[in-house]
Amino acid sequence: MSSQQAKAPHYFVPGPSRWPMMAGISMLITMIGASAWVNGVSWAPYVNILGILMVLVVLYYWFGDAIRESESGLYSERIDLSYRWSMSWFIFSEVMFFAAFFGTLFYARSITMPWLADLDHKLIWPDFSGQWGNVGPAGTVENFTTMGPFPIPTINTLLLLTSGVTLTISHHAMRAGHRTQTAVWLFLTILLGAVFMGFQAYEYIHAYSELNLKLSSGIYGSTFFMLTGFHGFHVTMGAIMLSVVLYRVLRGHFTPTHHFAFEGAAWYWHFVDVVWLGLYVVVYWL
């Protein structure tokens, strides 16, 4: 919400918008390109990049429409409440996504592995050991090394925890009316997120080139890249949201009492922090 809320009409009905449908189409193209890319299809990288560019363009115009409506004084307290509920349900849906992925990991480790290690399978594959990270029966998967918690995952954990602190400081500065401090701490939060993604990319290069850990490395490889990759996507989206918020802070769009765009992005970022803590423990330590 912006500083213009005091001018809001009693009731405002947003007009039709093409952006939700365009966002869905763009994300579909992105996922088609990504899925084909990991399967070695030659044209896949171009489709994936096209989809990403389309997503960015859609977000640019969609955010622009919302900002213009807010700055025009069209948003009332009821609209503000609807945004809060919408963001809450959106984050809840993301929680369900990660719950499904964590559930997959739990099933594979706690149910499937003991089943694979029972007496029947020992008779069929006498050299098979039912331990998490095992490559499976001989010849089914290339040998690889599992990813440990040091040093990159631990560094990334410290980076995200620190970013949560800097974002909280920025929010307190916003509520106190200190715009410069708000912008500085918010910029540091975005910078920490960018450094996190840089280390994540380096970790993937290390996994592929030195550990031979790939998406095709059995259930371990698929769950590892699914969980960490999906989380990395959320960090990227959170950094984009915070960048838009930083732009609006510098433009003076917010007041100490009306700044839900800031709060919504902060909710999302803290959610990303909490998910990473779960990943750090379950994926890298256990």
What do these predicted ranges mean?
Residues 1-286:
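...captures the hydrophobic TM-helix bundle architecture rather than a specific catalytic motif
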